[in-house]
Amino acid sequence: MVVPFKNEPGIDFSVQTNVERFNEELRKVKAQLGQDIPLVINGEKLTKTDTFNSVNPANTSQLIAKVSKATQDDIEKAFESANHAYQSWKKWSHKDRAELLLRVAAIIRRRKEEISAIMVYEAGKPWDEAVGDAAEGIDFIEYYARSMMELADGKPVLDREGEHNRYFYKPIGTGVTIPPWNFPFAIMAGTTLAPVVAGNTVLLKPAEDTVLTAYKLMEILEEAGLPQGVVNFVPGDPKEIGDYLVDHKDTHFVTFTGSRATGTRIYERSAVVQEGQQFLKRVIAEMGGKDAIVVDNNVDTDLAAEAIVTSAFGFSGQKCSACSRAIVHQDVHDEILEKAIQLTQKLTLGNTEENTFMGPVINQKQFDKIKNYIEIGKKEGKLETGGGTDDSTGYFIEPTIFSGLQSADRIMQEEIFGPVVGFIKVKDFDEAIEVANDTDYGLTGAVITNHREHWIKAVNEFDVGNLYLNRGCTAAVVGYHPFGGFKMSGTDAKTGSPDYLLNFLEQKVVSEMF
């Protein structure tokens, strides 16, 4: 009997023994860094001469892993492997596939601290964020395993005299998973194993910055007994293999989390029917946001300031749900801005090995992009705090607040994906909602208000996929807050929802006359 779903707990680092144990795990992981990461195709580990490096963004001289690069020939072999494995994997019962995923989750639970420690080094994640990432990966796997069991018998439809009808679900084939670097375990594991538990096979192209983290999942899948070829591991240069994976005639679906530019490119290319392709491809895309916290008058200003700061600067603003815009009623704007500045100036920034609140941004490209937006912000508004940058040893950017901005300003319209938040002063709640919707994106949002009628207005008019009342706009929890957005934030395929597996299933109807 499968026990009811329960979210995986984090680790309480206010307890000294937990701190000591995690420090020991960091030492163990650090001693093993620099290893070679192979491709994995049909269960075979392939080490290539053409490689790239994964480095610690907090200490760029520290090699995390030397990664083999997949070629287009390797991708062809991976598709052959996945297509072959699909013929038997799709015949596994729903229950057997789900139980295998539960074994995977149990192994991850046993290795949670190891996986978390790897993310501290490879992704520059603070301790709590790293542990939360690993725990969320467990949650996704546990949740999807149970979801598959619930879908096993299909859904009831009507019979009539002399006719029995069945409506049930079947897998669709081989697909491609392209996960992001910012949740290198949780999103990677969830978007890989959701289609797998549904009976499909996958080519997993991990994010280049966090390959070691993704490779740990491959080790765990092998230990759990996943058949060879069900998941094939193909790290590589997106410019060399990205389009090839998406365009391939055997790609039935692409699940992608990342930038708007890449997501729309995938969507466009997936619409082209290739020679020999007998189906329409599905795209499941999450492409970021320009998320806002709206603050009404007559609110708890301490709560509002804390919600803005934690949502803006957690994991250095490198969350698609991060608060990038603070839209504040004129009656409380100055007070909340001042409190937010004070809270921000207390945040610690540094190498997350030392358990700082904030660590580096992920790579040089992101560092340069964010630094450029800070310069733009200085021209468009007033720099209130932060703005400093340092890439001498790692990619560090101070938590930065701008005020005096207008909705049309670039730093209020374009996704920065870093520790930068802009304040806009509005005259009333109607204007606040108007400004909040003045964006191409619609992922998350929050409203701080004590006016029930204003909250109802936000529910009906604030055009985001995930809306929160009197809290920040980050930290969706699997099973409680299915996650996905509107507009240019993606296809709104809510992860961690009862409907998510339907993205990887076809519905079949069988009518039997008697």
UniProtKB/Swiss-Prot annotation:
GO cellular component, one term: cytoplasmic side of plasma membrane
Single Gene Ontology MF annotation: 1-pyrroline-5-carboxylate dehydrogenase activity
Active site as annotated: E286, C320
Gene Ontology biological-process annotations: glutamate biosynthetic process; proline catabolic process to glutamate
Catalytic activities: L-glutamate 5-semialdehyde + NAD(+) + H2O = L-glutamate + NADH + 2 H(+)
Signal peptide coordinates: none
Pathway listed: Amino-acid degradation; L-proline degradation into L-glutamate; L-glutamate from L-proline: step 2/2
InterPro entries given in the database record: Ald_DH/histidinol_DH, Ald_DH_C, Ald_DH_CS_CYS, Ald_DH_CS_GLU, Ald_DH_N, Aldehyde_DH_dom, Proline_metab_enzyme, RocA
EC annotation from Swiss-Prot or TrEMBL: 1.2.1.88
SUPFAM superfamilies hit by this protein: ALDH-like
Keywords from the UniProt entry: NAD, Oxidoreductase
UniProt xrefs under CDD domains: ALDH_PutA-P5CDH-RocA
Pfam families, per database record: Aldedh (PF00171)
Similarity section: Belongs to the aldehyde dehydrogenase family. RocA subfamily.
Official protein name in the record: 1-pyrroline-5-carboxylate dehydrogenase
Originating organism: Staphylococcus epidermidis (strain ATCC 35984 / DSM 28319 / BCRC 17069 / CCUG 31568 / BM 3577 / RP62A)
